[in-house]
Design a protein with these regions (language model features):
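Small-residue-enriched core segments of transmembrane alpha-helices in multipass membrane transport
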Residues: 162-169, 269-272, 349, 382-391
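Alpha-helical transmembrane segments of multipass membrane proteins
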Residues: 29, 33, 110, 144-148, ...
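Helix-terminus/linker motif at the lipid-water interface of multi-pass membrane proteins
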Residues: 22, 26-44, 112-119, 175-182, ...
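N-terminal transmembrane alpha-helices
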Residues: 2-33, 37-38, 51-66, 70, ...
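Short alpha-helical transmembrane segments in multi-pass integral membrane proteins
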Residues: 1-14, 71-137, 168-172, 177-233, ...
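Transmembrane helical elements of multi-pass membrane transporters/channels
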Residues: 12-31, 131, 135, 142, ...
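Small-residue-rich hydrophobic transmembrane alpha-helices
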Residues: 43-106, 139-158, 263-327, 359-380
Length: 437
């Protein structure tokens, strides 16, 4: 297959995945927009609570992502029975990992007094976190289902389930927040119910996938579970390192003030929306790299990775231009609080700077996942974010008195360091034959 053919296949796979990721992000934007009408403390509470939720749950997400490379490579080699068995073992991993994560979520608000947050913000964080903690279970199961379907090239049900969840979440937000007057807790409840509905919506699509009869497919397979966890736990660490640094910056912004924490949420919500496109491209790149490796074609895997990186670059450069020119209107779509807008608009200008780095690191991480290399993304994120980015963020935000804007300049530097490391690793790895996992 030539470059043009690979690009067509990649974009055909990425398109529905992008819509699915964007729909998921629209859920968060819906939560933010509706909670934003409750005031800065409520918005700050959801900002910190979201950071806690995603830091905890994304470790499980990374563990579940350990099934992506084995499934894609199995399908590339024509091993549909093995791919189906990996699905069910992935669901087992999702359920097993989610239980301790729910406990961690339940206990997390107890450490808020040591985080330096205001009393009103701490109350909102606790209410939101406790209301949303059970969402970890359907969130992880859904991602196991999605990994199998996207590797199989079946993406339409992912989009349909996401749209259904988006509509249900919006209705649930209005009902629980305003009709029942549950405040930020209502938003957490709505998200949990919407995620559960999305799992149920994908079940028929899973059952309809063509696979040879296999009465053993749902039986516990220790070897496959071990493979998923071996690849998944570094993925989990990588996701926690990445999401955790943004959550940490959210907490640090909260120490500056409620307006800064709320502005961080507004800016990260908008930046995450564009990031969804590169997540979709990265997921498609992971599948294509895995298919080529399963078929024994390392050259094809390298080409798929490079085409994915190029596609992400084009989009993120366009997104950067939009962020530069439309920041006031974008921020105003999520909040009408003048103090929040005054901080959010400069943050969006910084976000425009790191769009390219953010897109490249996400796509490179996807290519490495497809190649079965979970360790490079972990090390790159630990060094880039925690050794380089966060210290610079603290220095600029507090010692140089640049506030939330200084914190975000540190994030930008960290993302750039991660992108450079991951691209370099993929170029080195794909220059030689890659073994299947």
């Amino acid at each position: 297959m030539d470059d043009a053919g690979e690009l067509r296949v990649l974009l055909r796979l990425a398109g529905p995945l992008i819509l699915g990721y964007a729909g998921s992000q629209l859920m968060s934007m819906t939560d933010t927009a509706m909670v934003g009408r409750l005031g800065a403390d409520a918005l700050a509470g959801v900002s910190v609570g979201n950071g806690v939720y995603f830091t905890v749950s994304c470790f499980g997400l990374g563990c579940v992502a350990g099934m992506e490379a084995p499934i894609a490579q199995a399908l590339g080699a024509g091993e549909r029975v093995r791919a189906r068995r990996l699905l069910w073992q992935g669901v087992r991993v999702a359920l097993g990992v989610s239980l301790p994560l729910v406990v961690i979520m339940a206990l997390s608000p107890l450490v808020l007094p040591w985080a330096g947050l205001g009393a009103a913000t701490s109350r909102e964080v606790g209410a939101y976190t406790w209301a949303r903690m059970l969402n970890v279970v359907p969130f992880l199961v859904y991602n196991a289902q999605r990994s199998y379907l996207q590797a199989s090239g079946i993406t339409r049900p992912i989009v349909i389930s996401t749209v259904a969840g988006l509509i249900g979440n919006a209705i649930g937000n209005y009902f629980f927040i305003y009709t029942l007057r549950l405040g930020v807790a209502g938003s957490g409840i709505a998200s949990t119910l919407a995620s559960t509905a999305m799992v149920l919506a994908l079940a028929p699509a899973i059952a309809a996938v063509d696979a040879p009869p296999d009465p053993e497919r749902r039986r516990f397979d220790r070897a496959l579970v071990r493979t998923i966890l071996r690849l998944g736990h570094p993925n989990g660490g990588q996701v926690v390192a990445e999401v955790g640094v943004f959550a940490t910056v959210g907490v640090l912004a909260g120490r500056i003030g409620a307006a800064s924490a709320a502005a961080h949420l507004v800016a990260i919500t908008l930046a995450s929306f564009t990031f969804c496109v590169t997540l979709g491209i990265g997921a498609a790149t992971s599948v294509r790299v895995g298919h080529h490796i399963g078929a024994g074609a390392t050259d094809g895997a390298r080409r798929a990775g490079l085409i994915g990186l190029g596609s992400s670059s084009v989009f993120m450069l366009a997104a950067a231009l939009v962020f530069f020119t439309c920041a006031p209107w974008l921020a105003a779509a999520l909040t009408n609080d003048a103090s929040v807008l005054a901080v959010a608009i400069p943050l969006l200008h910084v976000a425009a700077i790191f769009q390219l780095s953010d897109g490249l690191q996400a796509t490179a991480a996807g290519a490495l996942r497809g190649a079965g290399d979970p360790h490079a993304p972990l090390y790159a994120n630990l060094v880039g974010h925690w050794v380089i980015g966060l210290p610079v963020a603290v220095a600029l935000g507090f010692f140089a008195h640049q506030g939330a804007v200084g914190l975000w300049w540190g994030l930008s530097l960290g993302l750039t360091a991660v992108a450079v490391g991951l691209i370099g690793r993929f170029l080195w790895l794909s220059a030689r034959p890659i073994r299947r996992v």
